[in-house]
């Protein structure tokens, strides 16, 4: 059970990845979580993320490699936010090949920019990793996390439309070539990201259960 989940900013990758990992008992590896942790102590990464730009391939690959080596991935894993470039894809292939591990499926959650921007603008998060939406998935108590009671906030790269548009543009330029790569390899599965969160979850779960 080894999977990759792709999609533009605001597609709901992180939300779905966490739920899928719990349901099937596999490891969730999120580069987004890794970056947000790293930016606390690395000013260069912080500046890149705040401007909507991609972190250099060498840094990303090294972070993922360390995380894969640190965790037991024999039971399966779900990569969320990686790979994002053709170079990262090649590095991932080499990493997995050395361990005789293969990717079973690549899920692409597809949503247009307008919908993604709307979702991002309303997204609020907690330091514990929980994510909410002011309209679509509000917390039980305004401004307070249901999981730990922490204060909810907007991520810095979610606040300005120009940054959101830049992030989407970077995705279009850097990540879309991967779609063709995984399509040609027969691993790509399209997921309609405009459906409800529960419907998207059921669609991905169904594909995994059916061995697609």
Swiss-Prot record:
ATP binds at residues 10-15, 123, 131-132, 195. It holds the Pfam family ADK. Transmembrane segments: none annotated. CDD domains: ADK. It catalyses: AMP + ATP = 2 ADP. Residues 30-55 are annotated as: NMP. Residues 122-158 are annotated as: LID. AMP binds at residues 31, 36, 53-55, 81-84, 88, 155, 167. The keyword Repeat does not apply. The keyword Transmembrane does not apply. It comes from the Bacteria. Pathway: Purine metabolism; AMP biosynthesis via salvage pathway; AMP from ADP: step 1/1. One of its GO terms (biological process) is AMP salvage. Catalyzes the reversible transfer of the terminal phosphate group between ATP and AMP. Plays an important role in cellular energy homeostasis and in adenine nucleotide metabolism. Monomer. This is Adenylate kinase. It comes from Endomicrobium trichonymphae. The lineage of its organism: Bacteria, Pseudomonadati, Elusimicrobiota, Endomicrobiia, Endomicrobiales. The gene is adk.
């Amino acid at each position: 059970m080894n999977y990759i989940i792709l999609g533009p900013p605001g597609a709901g990758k992180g939300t779905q990845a966490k739920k899928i990992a719990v349901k099937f008992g596999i490891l969730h590896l999120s580069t987004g979580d890794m970056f947000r942790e790293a930016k606390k102590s690395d000013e260069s990464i912080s500046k890149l993320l705040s401007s909507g730009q991609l972190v250099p391939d060498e840094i990303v690959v090294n972070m993922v490699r360390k995380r894969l080596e640190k965790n037991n991935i024999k039971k399966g894993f779900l990569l969320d936010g990686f790979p994002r470039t053709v170079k990262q894809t090649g590095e991932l292939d080499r990493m997995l090949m050395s361990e005789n591990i293969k990717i079973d499926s690549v899920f692409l959650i597809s949503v247009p920019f307008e919908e993604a921007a709307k979702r991002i603008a309303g997204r609020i998060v907690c330091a514990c990793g929980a994510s909410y939406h002011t309209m679509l998935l509000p917390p039980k108590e305004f401004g307070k996390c249901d999981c730990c009671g922490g204060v909810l906030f907007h991520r810095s790269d979610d606040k300005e439309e120009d940054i959101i548009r830049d992030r989407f543009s970077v995705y279009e330029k850097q990540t879309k070539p991967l779609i063709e790569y995984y399509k040609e390899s027969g691993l790509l599965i399209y997921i309609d990201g405009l459906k409800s969160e529960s419907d998207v979850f059921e669609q991905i779960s169904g594909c995994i259960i059916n061995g697609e």
